[in-house]
Amino acid sequence: MPVLRTKTSRMWLPDALRGLALLNMLAYHAMYDWVYVFGHESSWYNIWAPGCHVWQQYICWSFILLSGFSFPLAKRPAKNGLIVAGCAAVLTFVTAVFMPSEAIWFGVLHLNAAAVLLTCLVYPLLQRLPAGAGLAASAALFALTNQLPEGYLGFENWRLCAVPTGLYKTNWFWLGLPDLTQFASADYFPILPWVFLFWCGVFLARLWHPGRGEPPAALRPLCAIGRNTLLVYMLHQPVIYGALWVWHTVLG
């Protein structure tokens, strides 16, 4: 998600990967609005189809992992986290007021802000862990808690065991314990399991050191998009919705 920027020479490959994920996000959300908001049929786009699920997961995994990778590179991560938290609050207010059926109560921006601020608190402890061991442990915990919001431990369709239902009555949706009888969010990325994927990125930054400097000319537009992730994220839905509304009502 949002880039934690530095004033030093940037690593261009993470920017390019982030830009690629952003372009996929724009295409995915454009298709979602076209099919599920404006009611058009599609022969291939179905959010419940395995292919679309993999597409959606690639996008969110990329953002969260790269956000974690960017954390150690930031000079003021707490400030960045607070900025993202403010943007997340704006997003919740706007969607709750103007699109209540599509309200976002704890989406990927909220997760990114929470992960950054939480990591600021525990970063000295994370630094004590060997990078390889920390990466492996974070990946294992992410897999183990992947379906915690759905009521069990396990990854995707692999169910290890059910979680006591009483834990969900608190409706701590932000943590990953939603009461699904009363909670709904159009975009939902709770702290558990996703903070563990963020920490995978934090540890990966100690193991992987892409080169710095100018990117290849062909990748410069992609890198430029990747350097402005937060701005693109905040603007993309209004722009996509407006363009599709014109197409639907005027041209369609």
Located regions from the model:
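Alpha-helical transmembrane segments and their immediate juxtamembrane cytosolic regions
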Residues: M1-G252
